[in-house]
Amino acid sequence: MGSSKDSASVTNISVEEHFSVSQSSPGGQFVGPTEEISTAAEALIGRSTTLTEALKAASMNVGHKPVETTDVAAIKEVETRAIGGDIESEGGVTAVASKAVARNQKIGKDNEKTNLGDVIAEIDVKVTRDREVTSEDAEAVIRAELNHSPFNNIIPGGVAESVAAAYKLNHDPSSL
């Protein structure tokens, strides 16, 4: 029997008003969360925010947590969109995050695992091109994080939420 993750599908993602996600599954439709974006975005107020700056905001918010598969999916989407194409298989932030997840799965203690902040710390060296966050970027990153989450949720203050907050700031700086 398949898991709920296998049978659920993301049908609508909107970052225009508030961050909201609609999903349908065999048990019905889930809509949520509809809430204000976290305060990680406060570091980005005052100018157009780029994709890598949104990653840095996530690092400030939840950088202490061990890197997980959901983070890798969201980071890959950000990195691909920032550079405008295929990412390097070995040298990019996605590769570093993937290796960290593989290492973390072998380690039992959370305090010994590689955390999100460690991975994102090298973003300026690893990603040499960048651009302003768009609604399409935010929606794609949210979708990537959701599709790789074992619980079909977004990490509060994580990569997807920080990218959505960056888009909201770019679109309407008075939204926070």
Swiss-Prot record:
<comment type="function">
    <text>LEA proteins are late embryonic proteins abundant in higher plant seed embryos. The function of those proteins is not known.</text>
</comment>
<dbReference type="Pfam" id="PF04927">
    <property type="entry name" value="SMP"/>
</dbReference>
<dbReference type="InterPro" id="IPR042971">
    <property type="entry name" value="LEA_SMP"/>
</dbReference>
<dbReference type="InterPro" id="IPR007011">
    <property type="entry name" value="LEA_SMP_dom"/>
</dbReference>
<protein>
    <recommendedName>
        <fullName>Late embryogenesis abundant protein 49</fullName>
    </recommendedName>
</protein>
<dbReference type="GO" id="GO:0005634">
    <property type="term" value="C:nucleus"/>
</dbReference>
<dbReference type="GO" id="GO:0005829">
    <property type="term" value="C:cytosol"/>
</dbReference>
<keyword id="KW-0539">Nucleus</keyword>
<feature type="domain" description="SMP 1">
    <location>
        <begin position="49"/>
        <end position="106"/>
    </location>
</feature>
<keyword id="KW-0677">Repeat</keyword>
<comment type="similarity">
    <text>Belongs to the LEA type SMP family.</text>
</comment>
<keyword id="KW-0963">Cytoplasm</keyword>
<feature type="domain" description="SMP 2">
    <location>
        <begin position="115"/>
        <end position="171"/>
    </location>
</feature>
